[in-house]
Swiss-Prot record:
This is Small ribosomal subunit protein uS10. InterPro entries: Ribosomal_uS10, Ribosomal_uS10_CS, Ribosomal_uS10_dom, Ribosomal_uS10_dom_sf. Involved in the binding of tRNA to the ribosomes. Part of the 30S ribosomal subunit. One of its GO terms (molecular function) is tRNA binding. It comes from Campylobacter jejuni subsp. doylei (strain ATCC BAA-1458 / RM4099 / 269.97). PROSITE patterns: RIBOSOMAL_S10. GO terms for cellular component: ribonucleoprotein complex; ribosome. Keywords: Ribonucleoprotein, Ribosomal protein. One of its GO terms (biological process) is translation.
Amino acid sequence: MERIRLKLKAYDHRVLDRTVAAIVEAVKRTGADIRGPIPMPTKIKRYTVLKSPHINKDSREQFEIRIHARMLDIIAATPDTVDSLTKLDLAPEVSVEVRAMGK
């Protein structure tokens, strides 16, 4: 068939790694070749808010959220591989982006 690229993102790296392990196991069972998981750079979003609702701008609080990402390339995916990927029960915290690529 063709190559399939999966990009997975999550706030918790442990949930992300468990999901990646389940995908890798399902793909290897179908006999397709897999490249990865490739860890992508962690994106950090920082937010600064005032502690006081009215005055005192010197008093601020900072929050951050980290977005962890992994990438998988499935080489020579078969219809059986695609079927096993659609039947996987993935964690709801993980965002999965699927892109079919040419040979």
